[in-house]
A protein has these predicted regions:
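A glycine-rich, acidic short-motif signal
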Residues: 1-192
Length: 192
């Protein structure tokens, strides 16, 4: 599509400054779509590997928030992670991480899942990359925000967390670990 647009308009679309890729959640369940997406990203098309990938149940609802916002939606979303002191490393939420984990069977991809609160996008959960039960295919599985924090702590992507758990407050900071995590039916498993 990008190449056809370039040929039709006689101009080259520069995608190197794209900060965010927003994916519809249902696409994550489509193995063929995901395979095509990572193949495009790996084929030399100028899609920046460092763009942050967000997931939404309703991409249109998130995109339509731009009308009410004072700043660019893409910048707002990128800053939501990059400017957040809880995140030491956003590399697990990048397009490059998604591609690498898809091909190599890795499990470092942690994609934020967006919802809407007070007419602003908010992270309401995460999608974790994992290998399916057959051991052959990569899948992305949604977990709660709290489970995503645990996975982020285990991966080193999150360095500080403040959250409510069972009516109490937990504050963790300067966490350094070696890790391996998996999404399970009952939550997130983390081997430290």
């Amino acid at each position: 599509v990008i190449r056809r647009m370039d040929e039709k308009n006689g101009k080259i679309l520069d995608l190197n400054h794209v900060k965010v890729l927003l994916l519809e959640a249902e696409f994550l369940e489509e193995k063929d779509f995901m395979q095509e997406l990572v193949e495009i990203g790996n084929s030399g098309v100028d899609l920046p590997g460092n763009m942050i990938v967000f997931v939404a149940e309703d991409v249109d609802a998130i995109s339509n928030l731009q009308e009410e916002m004072d700043e660019d939606l893409g910048n707002y979303l990128a800053e939501m992670l990059e400017g957040n002191p809880n995140y030491e490393d956003t590399s697990g939420a990048t397009f490059k991480s998604l591609i690498c984990d898809w091909y190599n069977g890795g499990s470092s991809t942690i994609l934020p899942s967006l919802g809407v609160q007070d007419d602003l996008p908010v992270v309401e959960g995460y999608y974790l990359m994992q290998t399916d039960v057959s051991g052959d295919d990569q899948i992305l599985r949604k977990v709660t925000a709290e489970e995503g924090y645990v996975a982020g702590l285990c991966s080193g992507a999150i360095g500080m967390v403040d959250m409510d758990v069972d009516g109490g407050q937990i504050h963790l900071e300067n966490v350094k670990v070696s890790y391996e995590y998996t999404a399970t039916n009952s939550g997130v498993g983390c081997q430290l």
